[in-house]
Amino acid sequence: MPQKSRYSDEQVEQLLAELVSVLEKHHTPTDLSLMVLGNMVTNLINTSIAPAQRMLIADSFVHALRASIDEGNIH
């Protein structure tokens, strides 16, 4: 997601590492990780964003997610 952010790379990486650590601690399979993270995103949008802006934010999130997906093979 190559976009200018008000947050430092260090802040983002630290939080990401902590979230990954929690998922690893619980030996969370990929599908469950995606379900939990998706539910977290939904909850954040529904509780922190004005109703009139929710679909715009969700669409922006989906666009950024799709743009950041690496379509290369991992296996």
Curated annotation (Swiss-Prot):
It holds the Pfam family DUF1414. InterPro entries: UPF0352, YejL_sf. NCBIfam families: PRK13689.1 (NF010242). Belongs to the UPF0352 family. This is UPF0352 protein PMI0824. It comes from Proteus mirabilis (strain HI4320).
